[in-house]
Amino acid sequence: MGFARGQKIDVKDLVVEDGYVYANVTSVGADTAGLLPDLMKGIVTGLNFPKSMHWGSLDFHFVRPIRWFVALFDKDVIPFELANVKSGNVSRGHRFLGTGDFTIESPAAYEETCKEHFLIVDPEVRKQMILEGLQKLADEKGGTIIMDDDLLEEVVYLVEYPTALCGEFDEDYLKLPEAAIITPMKDHQRYFPMRDKDGKLMNLFLTVRNGNDYHLETVQHGNERVLRARLDDAKFFFEEDKKHKLADYTEKLKKIVFQDGLGTLYDKAQRLEKITVFLNHKLDLGLDDAKLQRASLLAKADLATQMVMEFTELQGVMGKEYASSTAKMPAWPKPSTNSTSAFVRRRPAADRHGQSPGIADKFDTITGMFSRGFIPTGSQDPLPCAARPSVPSTSSWMPAGTSTAMKSFLRPQSPRRRRGRRSQVMGQLDDLL
């Protein structure tokens, strides 16, 4: 009886077969046009972003204020309203090149109509336009683009109608370390550097404007002026930092807090000295304790330099630069990468003097943060260094006889397997330390 009522049919219409009761129910299809309005609103509200905003007096959040909707089913507008905005078939062209509002007659005409108003809607088409434009300029200048896929992807979504252009800067800036030139270009200005046929950095850069090729010279000069200011800053910081030895900056680490309850960066450097020596003896690496301690003490020193304070992306890179100019270090700790394992395996033992502080740094950060209760419990890891392959991959160069606790802690594991293993990880840390 209850089953029949649930299916909205009479009991006499039920079908009994092989001990089971069936109900034959015919579902009538709904009108597509009637379903689409709610589907359209669901698509918009279903988009999630790490950060969103609300505007006006609306109780509605989105990544940016919504100005208009274009929603078409064939040539008919799909009617709906969201965030006080009604759907229609009218869009707007490029802010500077477009001629204002324009009508989209049908979905099939969408892409071509937008193009007529200087909007390239397909990101793959924009990417191809950018690549072809950059390559053409590089060929004309006899250079090779230092391509960065992440930067390219970012630029693709920064422009609606891309046009590549080339700029230059004073050759005197080439006296700076390469990283001090490339970092402001890529990370701050979204420029693409170039190398000459000998692999040397050129005093040229490539960039992409959001517009056509009109008045490119004016745009070029504007970009050159902005980059010049960035490089002036880098030059000043570099020259000021070079007035002191890298070791002199370790004292300044006493004024930089690492984490509440875990002391300053100077305290962290002191711990690294002890951990590297411990690992050296525990793993029987056969490294020089004095060199390990020296590298550990200097590993964080560049965090107190003006260059790194201004361009944080240069952490470790400038430390190597300053260390090389003031003292002969056997191997400076390189910035963490996903290829730490390969780096260690393919280098002689001398390089491990520089690698060991990096490994010790990860140990110290993970154990310290865990001890303070900062333990990842989901997919959002508050400790990016804990999830990087650079830590677990180091187990590949551990000698025979390494403790099971240490190998277990360093064994590569997927993020999914890490989740929900708090007690197990804490147990491994306890066994290890």
Predicted features by range, described:
Residues 1-433:
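Amphipathic alpha-helical "coupling" segments that flank catalytic cores
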